[in-house]
Amino acid sequence: MESFTADTNSTDLHSRPLFKPQDIASMVILSLTCLLGLPGNGLVLWVAGVKMKRTVNTVWFLHLTLADFLCCLSLPFSVAHLILRGHWPYGLFLCKLIPSVIILNMFASVFLLTAISLDRCLMVHKPIWCQNHRSVRTAFAVCGCVWVVTFVMCIPVFVYRDLLVVDDYSVCGYNFDSSRAYDYWDYMYNSHLPEINPPDNSTGHVDDRTAPSSSVPARDLWTATTALQSQTFHTSPEDPFSQDSASQQPHYGGKPPTVLIATIPGGFPVEDHKSNTLNTGAFLSAHTEPSLTASSSPLYAHDFPDDYFDQLMYGNHAWTPQVAITISRLVVGFLVPFFIMITCYSLIVFRMRKTNLTKSRNKTLRVAVAVVTVFFVCWIPYHIVGILLVITDQESALREVVLPWDHMSIALASANSCFNPFLYALLGKDFRKKARQSVKGILEAAFSEELTHSTSCTQDKAPSKRNHMSTDV
């Protein structure tokens, strides 16, 4: 086996394969989202937050716009990360912060949309109660609770994200306790393993989702269909190698490096070997004995027999946080809110049909339904890909089809951040009047407090000035 020398460590990023179509599409989507979303959401924040009269609806959509604006602020880092093909030059703090912002946008948006749906449902079915209890202060309190829950849901991303540094190459990924799970393992291998043919794919987008394991046979390491696999590093308290080798070893969060025993591609940390060799301080099986010296790479992929990865057993140590994060995002951030919203809007439609008021011109209801629809269209691919990567077999044909679209689904989810301002403009008033309408007028029409009247409202409402004025809160 040819030894690894310093010359092989000088692989230039520009010498790697050209971007795949999925990478180019992701960069285009993210760039357009940033270019359109920042001014669009910024304008809505300024007008709705400063120029417009404060109402319950403006509070809802103001906080929703704030979540979108924060997400758009993080997108330039994601685009640069994609261009750099996995290299993360921004340090440990932003490695934790940027992926957390993307997840923050998801949870804040879905929770606020759920609150808006419940609010609209109550206005249709309990109009008198809403006139007496629905207020701007209550809306602010609900939004405050939404942000608290949202930050709690982002804690796992902030805690488990870590920075792996090998020489001058940094990778931002997930770190589950004593094992290191990192995205973009193919480029880390490609940078240090010159004898292996370079992969035909490229990576880069910040993956805010934990990636499942990839126990790929050695012959398939460089033909994987995606680079959004994780890289798992397992360390041992005992150092079977010389201290000189530490200079080549990866280290985490800028801390001094620990000696790397083995490098195995896969999203789930490798805790044990079926032959129990880890208990004796050795990671590799008896028939695999690659050496690691100061002038050698961590491990050559072709040193692993084809059946070596089949001998690995993944511990529950990382399975628990990884699957828990994926499932919690699906259930709390998608399924439960989706069920609540479908129920609310179904009840609204049922009441409107029952009272023969299907042509009621409730502008805010139309805006809310449109925003909810766009949100779920953008985020459905993200959750589908995440679940499929968890449940599919490592060598299944379905997995090979899904993997190339992993970071594309993240780009599409991020694109949701730029759509809402345009929905407000298109649905607020008749489109033919938009050109002559000021931004304030458009948003006032979109966020109007016009109630969807029901039979009970018509029969029970009091013709008092107080009740009349309370509809504009």
Curated annotation (Swiss-Prot):
One of its GO terms (biological process) is positive regulation of vascular endothelial growth factor production. Glycans are attached at residues 9, 201. It is a multi-pass membrane protein. The modification Phosphothreonine is found at residue 452. Keywords: Cell membrane, Chemotaxis, Disulfide bond, G-protein coupled receptor, Glycoprotein, Membrane, Phosphoprotein, Receptor, Sulfation, Transducer, Transmembrane, Transmembrane helix. It comes from the Eukaryota. One of its GO terms (molecular function) is G protein-coupled receptor activity. Pfam families: 7tm_1 (PF00001). The chain crosses the membrane at residues 24-46, 58-80, 97-118, 140-160, 330-349, 367-389, 407-427. The modification Phosphoserine is found at residue 448. Gene3D superfamilies: Rhodopsin 7-helix transmembrane proteins. SUPFAM superfamilies: Family A G protein-coupled receptor-like. Receptor for the chemotactic and inflammatory peptide anaphylatoxin C3a. This receptor stimulates chemotaxis, granule enzyme release and superoxide anion production. Belongs to the G-protein coupled receptor 1 family. PANTHER family: C3A ANAPHYLATOXIN CHEMOTACTIC RECEPTOR, CHEMOTACTIC RECEPTOR. This is C3a anaphylatoxin chemotactic receptor. It comes from Rattus norvegicus.
